[in-house]
Amino acid sequence: MFMSDLHSHHVNLRLVTKYRVSAEFPDVPGTPSLLFDERPPLGDGRGPNAAMVLGAAIGDCLSATLMNCLIRAHVDVEALTATVVTRVARNHAGRFRISGIEVELCPTVPPSERAGLERCQVIFQDYCTVTESVREGIRVTVSLTQPASDNGNVGTPVAATENPV
């Protein structure tokens, strides 16, 4: 089933040097840019790479979704931590792929409110936009375009691909 877009989020990326890329978030004014970099030997490791950020996005979404459920259930959350491990392995063609993501959420709630935590444990993941989208597979469309020239010509499309989901 194809979903109609309700929201869209924009990220602008700019090459800084070699494998280092700066990401800006124009939808959130005042947000500092995020620097991505590949681990050595490709990059210098001066920032997280895309696999790390994917893990962080899933961990953040699960944390926020759990908090939303607990708040709605009137559970007093004293603390919440999350640990995410993103595993990378080679596929059958020898190319690196994300082979799994493990998330451990550790909420601290008073013993008297454990029943609310247990109720949320059953349902909260279904409401996590990022995690459930990754689990289902996300349609990704990629286009490769030559930038506009200095004389004002419009960018020239080179190629476009889309994965079937």
Model-based region annotation:
Residues 1-56, 67-165:
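Extended beta-strand/beta-hairpin segments
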Residues 61-62:
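Alpha-helical metal-binding/catalytic segments enriched in His/Glu/Asp
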